[in-house]
Amino acid sequence: MFTPSQDDVRRFFCETHRKQEAREILTPLEAIARDWLLQHPEYARDFSDIDRALAADYSVEHGAPNPFLHLSMHLSIAEQVSIDQPPGIKAAYLALARRLDGEHAAHHQIMECLGDMLWQSQRSGLPPDGAAYIDCVRRRA
C-alpha cells in the first residue's frame, strides 16, 4: 500500500500545478489530479508555492480548509470508482452523480461518507468499514 507523507502529497500537487501552468507533459496520475485542480481554482494559490505549501498549517484549530486533503480525497474517490473498490462504489457513485446532475457534486457527497468512515476507523481502532461506506453513499443517492 502506498502511504505518502504529508510533504510528499503537497509536493505532488504543487508539482502537478507547476507542470500544468508550464504546459508540460503530465503522468497519468498527474492528469487526473490536474482535472481536479482545474475544478478548484480557489486553491491555485495554495499549490503555486511549494515552500509555503510545505509550511502551511491546515489544522482544525485554524479553521481553513485543507486543499491538499480535499484534492487527495477527489483522487481517492476517482481511483475507487475506476476499479469499483470497495465493491459497489461505482454503481453508488453513478446513481449519486445522476441524482445530483454532476460528478463533482457526487464526489463532495462521497467525501462526507469517506471522511466519516475513516474517522470511525481511527476512533475504534478497527479497519475501515467498506460496507458502511457504500451504504452511506447509497443513502445519498
Regions found by a protein language model. Give the residues of each.
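Heme-based O2/NO sensor domains and their adjacent alpha-helical segments
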Residues: 39, 43-98
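Glycine-rich, aromatic-bearing surface loops/beta-hairpins
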Residues: 116-141
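Short alpha-helical scaffolding segments that buttress acidic/His motifs in well-ordered protein cores
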Residues: 13, 33, 37, 72-77, ...
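Alpha-helix N-cap/helix-initiation sites
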Residues: 6, 23-27, 70, 86, ...
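A short structural micro-motif
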Residues: 36, 53-54, 99, 113-120, ...
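Short coil/turn segments at secondary-structure boundaries
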Residues: 26-30, 46-50, 88-94, 108-111, ...
